Amino acid sequence: MSHSYHHEETPDSIYKIIDTFSNATPHVPVHRRETVFQSLMVTCGVTESLHIGWLTLAVKHVVAQRGDNIQDPTDYFDLMTSLIGRFSVREIIDSSVKMASYLSEIKFKMTPDDLKKDKILDTNMTQDDIINFHYFINFFMYRLYSSHDFIHGQLARITEEEELNLNEAYGTLLNKLLQYTEVIFKIPLSYWSRQNEPYF
């Protein structure tokens, strides 16, 4: 079974609905955001939508960090992290694999046409935004898999049978993260060496 990421696998309507809900996040009461977004993911199908939800919220977070943006980026990051406790370990791992697959396939240097073709990225994202997006997802994944709540909470509660069923998922996740790490180290370094500027 291939684990490469392809936009065509998910209907356009799901991307549009998730983008609409993500844009509305700051206007939803904080105590309702998790429930609303979880319900959206379940309605769309967690397997098909959770990774898109995380990636879309990450885009909003990165764009909101610009100096000219008045939106607080923590609205999106807080929702991303709080959603972790709302889904099963298998759903989280499978969604992480899809995020790593997606990021491994998008370029660090994108033209306006590239951005228009992508169903997740903002068409107004700058080159710095795209690089910061990669960095932010790396940071999110690190926070996720080093989280005390995830390790000593969700992972600690799985049964032996569930753990056996997760072995392949663990292997796939590690493989994808290693592949993505290679992308992180190779592409941006070569890009910045041509620009004579430091990476980050």
Which residues does each PLM region occupy?
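Structural marker for long, regular alpha helices in very large eukaryotic proteins
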Residues: M1-F200
